[in-house]
């Protein structure tokens, strides 16, 4: 990847925004970065991997231990080749309605 972005969830105390919404918003950031990169013709991927949970990595990124979390690493670059399509589940077998 030509670029790797680290996305952190850094919740703060706020009278109107619950911590859970702050955490969810960092996931939305990751998803929007993927969408934007792909719309511009780049290949992109969102991974966490072991280093997202590593204290040294958190320290390196300036995160607050036990407060901030790495939501993921966004890899952006150019495709060398088209990825092969993986088998997908049949929606009717995994979705149920009430």
Where are these regions (language model features)?
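Glycine/small-residue-rich phosphate/adenosyl-binding loop
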Residues: 1-26
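Short coil/turn connectors at secondary-structure junctions
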Residues: 1-3, 42, 66-70
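Acidic, glycine-rich active-site loops and adjacent beta-strand->loop/helix elements
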Residues: 11-12, 50-54, 80
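GST superfamily/GST-like fold recognition
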Residues: 17, 21, 42-56
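A short mixed-secondary-structure module that forms the rim of ligand-binding clefts
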Residues: 27-33
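Short hydrophobic alpha-helices that are characteristic scaffold elements of the AMP-binding
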Residues: 35-39
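Short low-complexity, flexible loop/linker segments enriched in glycine and/or proline
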Residues: 60-63
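C-terminal helix-cap and adjacent tail motif
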Residues: 66, 70-98
């Amino acid at each position: 990847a030509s670029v790797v972005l680290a996305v952190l969830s850094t919740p703060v105390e706020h009278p109107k925004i619950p911590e859970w919404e702050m955490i969810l918003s960092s996931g939305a950031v990751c998803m929007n970065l993927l969408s934007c990169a792909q719309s511009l013709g780049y290949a992109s991927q969102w991974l966490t991997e072991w280093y997202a949970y590593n204290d040294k990595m958190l320290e390196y990124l300036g995160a607050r231990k036990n407060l901030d979390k790495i939501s993921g690493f966004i890899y952006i670059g150019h495709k060398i080749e088209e990825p092969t399509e993986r088998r997908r589940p049949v929606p009717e077998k995994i979705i149920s309605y009430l």
